[in-house]
Amino acid sequence: MACARPLISVYSEKGESSGKNVTLPAVFKAPIRPDIVNFVHTNLRKNNRQPYAVSELAGHQTSAESWGTGRAVARIPRVRGGGTHRSGQGAFGNMCRGGRMFAPTKTWRRWHRRVNTTQKRYAICSALAASALPALVMSKGHRIEEVPELPLVVEDKVEGYKKTKEAVLLLKKLKAWNDIKKVYASQRMRAGKGKMRNRRRIQRRGPCVIYNEDNGIVKAFRNIPGITLLNVTKLNILKLAPGGHVGRFCIWTESAFRKLDDLYGTWRKAASLKSNYNLPMHKMLNTDLSRILKSPEIQRALRAPRKKIHRRVLKKNPLKNLRIMLKLNPYAKTMRRNTILRQARNHKLRVERAAAALAAKSDPKEAPAKKKPVVGKKKKPVVGRKAAAAKKPAADKKAADKRAGPEDKKPAA
């Protein structure tokens, strides 16, 4: 399937190229902004809502009064009287059966939304540009595998069709009937209460046929399920991007396709059928980033690539890792060896001393004589300061004996 060419082929009612070509309008090259399309769709869809509200009297059409305190029941207003189940039941409150709702809805809610005209046009331009890309159209679920070209343009003769069988034959010749068969297969019953409100069945969307003049084309196509018909001067974002998602499959008549440049203009001239409107421009004229980065202007401003790879090395604890410690301190191995030898030598000395002490204990002759303990008045061993004090007089006596000379020992005359 061909797409995004400067020239678009025009197909006849037989499904073959008629030989005529149309220049691709500039609107199909507009920037695709799904965010703007979704925002505009959401706000415009709100304008179709019908105001609704509950009755102002709902929940208040009874006589009720609170019983007050002291009755071991809630202070909610209660229905008066007796003789029925209703008497004594709570009323008015949103937590009561038969009471009003919380914040009853009002019809003066802000139902409608105003959207800027330029923003609406931007959304339509994005939706049209997306309809020319097969990938986006197929992602939306349209069966366009056999369609010869996108965007698909047919001759103006189609605008004069008045019979549905002619429209069906055209779709089959253009290989677009697969999209209609998808719609038939998707018809099903709606879930929810819409079944009771004249909205029983739902189905998928089919092609969108866009024409310039209605010479019977609306009557011919309107009864085919899934088909949407739009006049090129009244394009609607709700139809071009159902659900706020771009990528609708569009079939154009030749005159409608040629009119797009007058409606939306190009980047060289403004739109002639709209006042003061210019086609939105891309923020990037060239979206090929690889081509931009490889351009000589960019390459001149860039530094040369660093081809040396600096890998992060895991830091290891040298106190736990001997190999790292030897890198930092080669003498650590000798220190560790000396420590081991010293510990072995000290252990050997301790063992020898313990053996000698054990041998001395086992031999009683060689055992040294024990000193007699100092005994007090009550024949109990004296400990601490008392023992030291008891020993001092003996020492003083010995010192006095030593100081006494031979002259002291002479007898008295």
Curated annotation (Swiss-Prot):
Post-translational modification: Citrullinated by PADI4.
Record cross-link Glycyl lysine isopeptide (Lys-Gly) (interchain with G-Cter in SUMO1), residues: K361
Gene of this entry: RPL4
Keyword Cytoplasm carried by entry: yes
Positions of modified residues (N6-acetyllysine): K14, K106, K259, K333, K361
UniProt protein name: Large ribosomal subunit protein uL4
Citrulline: residues bearing it: R300
GO molecular function: structural constituent of ribosome
InterPro entries: Ribos_uL4_C_dom (IPR025755), Ribosomal_uL4 (IPR002136), Ribosomal_uL4_dom_sf (IPR023574), Ribosomal_uL4_euk/arc_CS (IPR013000), Ribosomal_uL4_euk/arch (IPR045240)
Cross-link Glycyl lysine isopeptide (Lys-Gly) (interchain with G-Cter in SUMO2), where in sequence: K239, K327
Positions carrying N-acetylalanine: A2
Function (record text): Component of the large ribosomal subunit. The ribosome is a large ribonucleoprotein complex responsible for the synthesis of proteins in the cell.
Keyword set, alphabetical order: Acetylation, Citrullination, Cytoplasm, Isopeptide bond, Methylation, Phosphoprotein, Ribonucleoprotein, Ribosomal protein, Ubl conjugation
GO terms classed as biological process: translation
Family recorded in the similarity comment: Belongs to the universal ribosomal protein uL4 family.
Biased composition (Basic and acidic residues): 393-413
Compositional bias of kind Basic residues: 370-383
PANTHER family: 60S RIBOSOMAL PROTEIN L4
